From Swiss-Prot:
Binding site for substrate: 78, 176, 220
The entry's keywords: Aminopeptidase, Hydrolase, Metal-binding, Protease
Family: Belongs to the peptidase M24A family. Methionine aminopeptidase type 1 subfamily.
Organism field: Rickettsia prowazekii (strain Madrid E)
Cofactor(s) needed: Co(2+); Zn(2+); Mn(2+); Fe(2+)
Cross-referenced PROSITE patterns: MAP_1
Textual note on the cofactor: Binds 2 divalent metal cations per subunit. Has a high-affinity and a low affinity metal-binding site. The true nature of the physiological cofactor is under debate. The enzyme is active with cobalt, zinc, manganese or divalent iron ions. Most likely, methionine aminopeptidases function as mononuclear Fe(2+)-metalloproteases under physiological conditions, and the catalytically relevant metal-binding site has been assigned to the histidine-containing high-affinity site.
Protein's UniProt name: Methionine aminopeptidase
Subunit structure and binding partners: Monomer.
Enzyme class: hydrolase
Catalytic reaction equation(s): Release of N-terminal amino acids, preferentially methionine, from peptides and arylamides
Positions contributing to a divalent metal cation 1 binding: 95, 106, 234
Gene: map
UniProt-listed Enzyme Commission number(s): 3.4.11.18
């Protein structure tokens, strides 16, 4: 498997793309509240991205009909924005990918809708922490399995399950590239990380078991089979000489809710 190795100039491009993706999530934060539709959030994000001379990557990607993904409660990923209002107590993941100057910045965060119960709050916190545990093992010479192991062991320690069917991915001048970044695995196994690799780390963690269902109606929406809650966070990162760089950090330090 040949994995692209990027230059310092490429890092500069990815910093810009990642920053805009993060700024989009910063921008939308105050708009996520009860009675707002995910379609309205989609339109706001679309306009924000295009006003910054960028393109929302999901729109028309393999036929996806919207500019962002909005995944509510038991939706794991790839939820399609619609006209149904958000309800008090919902949790929602907003996943944004921008194309800026030909480079892709991909990130997602969880949001509370109004007053959220303690159980979903705990799931969200553990999911964020699991992502960061996975990112923190990244350095030249580490293995892909180290990332998955760090995420899986942390999530399972808190009695949650890690989705197997969807993964992180290589990224750069293409949306989804090699390698796949599994959110489960064994230490010391898999591809050896090298300086200059770019990829996403994006654990999807379920309160119940890890089985998922892909909607036969729209061909996109993924839900938990047991209808348990699911949470996800995502960062785009690069492997540096002595560790990692996160390209999609929030400029406003809105890392996880409450914001």
């Amino acid at each position: 498997m040949t994995i692209k190795i990027h230059t310092e100039k490429d890092f500069i491009k990815m910093r810009a793309a990642g920053k805009l993706a993060a700024e989009t999530l910063d921008f939308i934060t105050d708009h996520v509240k009860p009675n707002v539709t995910t379609n309205s959030l989609n339109d706001l994000c679309h306009n924000f991205i295009t006003s910054h001379n960028a393109i929302p990557a999901p729109l028309n990607y393999k036929g996806f009909p919207k500019s962002i993904c909005t995944s509510i409660n038991h939706v794991v990923c790839h939820g399609i924005p619609n006209d149904k209002p958000l309800k008090n107590g919902d949790i929602v993941n907003i996943d944004v990918t921008v194309i800026l100057d030909g480079w892709y910045g991909d990130t997602s965060r969880m949001y509370y809708v109004g007053d959220v119960a303690i159980k979903p709050k705990r799931l969200i916190q553990v999911t964020y922490d699991a992502m960061m545990k996975g990112i923190e093992v990244v350095r030249p010479g580490a293995k892909l399995g180290d990332i998955g192991y760090a995420i899986q062991s942390y999530a399972e320690k808190h009695n949650y399950s890690v989705v197997r069917d969807y993964t992180g991915h290589g990224i750069g001048r293409v949306f989804h590239d090699k390698p796949s970044i599994l959110n489960y695995g064994r230490n010391g196994t898999g591809l050896t990380l090298k300086e200059g690799m770019f990829f996403t780390v994006e654990p999807m963690i379920n309160a119940g078991n890890y089985d998922t269902i892909l909607s036969k109606l729209d061909g996109w929406t993924v839900t938990t089979r047991d209808k348990s809650l699911s949470a996800q966070f995502e960062h785009t990162i690069g492997v540096t000489k002595d560790g990692f760089e996160i390209f999609t950090l929030s400029p406003k330090k809105l890392d996880y809710p409450p914001y």
